[in-house]
Design a protein with these regions (language model features):
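Auxiliary, metal-adjacent structural segments of Zn-dependent hydrolase domains
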Residues: 1-52
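Surface-exposed patches in mature extracellular/periplasmic domains of secreted proteins
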Residues: 1-11, 84-85, 89-95, 126-129, ...
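Secretory-pathway/luminal and periplasmic proteins that interact with or process carbohydrate-rich
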Residues: 15-21, 122-125, 175-180
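Short intrinsically disordered coil segments
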Residues: 25-26, 65-68, 130
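Zinc-dependent metallopeptidase catalytic helix centered on the HExxH motif
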Residues: 33-123
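Stable alpha-helical elements in mature extracytoplasmic
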Residues: 66, 70, 74, 78, ...
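A short, charged helix-loop
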Residues: 127, 132-138
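Pan-zinc metallopeptidase signature
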Residues: 136-219
Length: 219
């Protein structure tokens, strides 16, 4: 896919980032606390907006993987831009129809960007925190968990069916992934496998994610 020319805008504070795109403030309110520190930018049609590198580093917690996830945020935004080109209609810009579409498939668009960028390799500590906060996550993940847990669906697919299947799923869309991505079993059994996968990720020394590469695999 030809992504065309893109400008990258670095912001010197979260307030500047929010002022540039009101969608960010709304998405932050819709996101679970365990994932909010990783909401550091947005992908427009011709621009990527992200916090400056020093601010990304400052947002990292002292747990393993946090800094790596934040440093990969620009790659995730590039993947998010590519996904929006293939699956149009998600915010930004913000509008009623775009918001409705995002609410229904946030796990897919945010999770695919996370997996393609390589962030899923470093998500274990954040997943552990999420599993100890609040109710058990839904399957597929609700919007509040999309930024953190969406990538684990693609990670499970890559482990079971291979990376090519996971990359193909990013092209095909959310309905196709759930209906045909895991052949030979129903959605309920896929949910059970996903919950087991989350539990393994949350274990000390648990497996890291299998991550795609946004620049070379999304085409």
């Amino acid at each position: 896919m030809d992504l065309g020319e893109l400008s990258v805008v670095l912001h010197g504070s979260p307030a500047q980032l929010d002022a540039a795109q009101p969608w960010i403030a709304l998405q932050r309110r819709l996101t679970a606390p365990a994932a909010r520190r990783y909401l550091v930018g947005w992908a427009g049609e011709r621009e990527l907006h992200v916090l400056a590198p020093r601010l990304l580093a400052q947002r990292a917690s002292n747990v393993e993987g946090s800094l790596e996830m934040l440093m990969l945020a620009p790659s995730a935004l590039l993947a998010r831009h590519a996904l929006a080109r293939r699956h149009p209609g998600f915010p930004p810009p913000l509008g009623p129809l775009r918001l409705k579409r995002w609410m229904g498939a946030a796990w897919f668009v945010e999770g695919a960007a996370q997996w393609l960028s390589g962030q899923t390799r470093h998500v274990r500590p954040a997943v552990t925190r999420r599993l100890h906060e609040g109710r058990a996550p839904a399957f597929p993940p609700r919007p509040a968990d999309a930024l953190l847990l969406g990538g684990t669906v693609f990670d499970l697919l890559a482990r079971e069916e291979g990376e090519r299947a996971a990359v193909a799923a990013t092209r095909d869309g959310p309905a196709q992934l759930l209906e045909r991505g895991f052949p030979g079993r129903g959605l309920r059994h896929t949910e059970d496998a996903w919950r087991s996968h989350l539990s393994r990720l949350a274990e000390p020394g648990g497996p890291g994610g299998r991550a795609g590469r946004a620049g070379s695999r999304f085409s």
